[in-house]
Amino acid sequence: VDTTQLLKGVLDLAVLAVLRAEDGYGYDIMRRLRAAGLEEIGDASVYGTLRRLFNAGLLTTYVVPSEEGPHRKYYALNAAGRDQLDRSGKVWRAFASTMDSLLDDRGVAA
């Protein structure tokens, strides 16, 4: 099953959720998403999502010097980002619950 369209619909929420636990730079965020099970996530999708969330006022950034190469731009949730995560998380949970019910009622195995 091609999950590309599903990922597009939930990538903002996934990035916000990853940043709830800890600030991160682009590659680190992508690595954490993949480790959580979103292996198909592309680099461009993650970086584009970070830019979009920042431009929407949901993230702040800061630069940290790195001894292993160029400085790293870290992303962090701000108050608006936490509010958006809470709202989107509630919508997602309700949607997922509805889909679970539909699949269970039709005898579709989990």
Give the ranges of each region predicted by the language model.
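N-terminal helix-turn-helix DNA-binding core of bacterial DNA-binding proteins
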Residues: 3-47
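Short, hydrophobic-biased segments on the C-terminal half of alpha helices
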Residues: 47-54
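Beta-hairpin "wing" of winged helix-turn-helix
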Residues: 56-70, 76
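Accessory beta->alpha helical hairpin/"wing" motif in late/C-terminal subdomains of nucleic-acid enzymes
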Residues: 77-81
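Amphipathic alpha-helical dimerization/coiled-coil segments
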Residues: 83-110
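Alpha-helix C-terminal capping/helix-coil junction sites
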Residues: 34, 54-55
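Short beta-strand/turn micro-motifs at beta-sheet edges
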Residues: 1-5, 63-64
